[in-house]
Amino acid sequence: MLYVKNLHKSYQSGNKSYSVLKGINLSVADQEFVAVMGPSGSGKSTLLNCISCYIPFEQGTITLGNKELKGLDETALAKVRNEKLGFVFQDFMLLDGLTIRENILVPKIIQGKVDQEAEKLADKLLSLFG
């Protein structure tokens, strides 16, 4: 389970501070798909970058399972990003020469962890789209 509690992020421009995320709260169950939607400049990418700890945030907590992500060293964060978090961005990004199923499995292929469980999950995801 992913929990985001009271997340705040702002950016500085000159003498001004711009609050982009103000008290964001959300929870996402294991294997749940969530769409983050909004107009350009609304903070969608900032939220995802905070969740993955690519950028710092001023206030709040992000917990995955029983681990708070803020404060993990880069090695531990890389492991979390590779094994526990996944993002699909709005740009169409399939790899030419691979089937859709193989594209779904790309992260597992890179990790060298294509197993029966990963293949079943890929098939399940494909069945959602017919």
Predicted segments with their positions:
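A short, flexible loop at the N-terminus of ABC-type nucleotide-binding domains that lies
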Residues: 1, 10-23, 73
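Conserved beta-strand
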Residues: 4-7, 19-29, 60
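The feature captures the beta-strand-to-loop junction immediately N-terminal to the Walker
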Residues: 37-39
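Helix-to-loop junction immediately C-terminal to a conserved catalytic motif
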Residues: 52
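Conserved ABC transporter NBD signature motif
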Residues: 60-71
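Conserved ABC ATPase "signature" region
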Residues: 67-68, 105, 116-130
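ABC ATPase NBD coupling module
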Residues: 69-86
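Short coil-to-helix segment of the ABC ATPase nucleotide-binding domain corresponding to the Q-loop/switch region
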Residues: 97-107
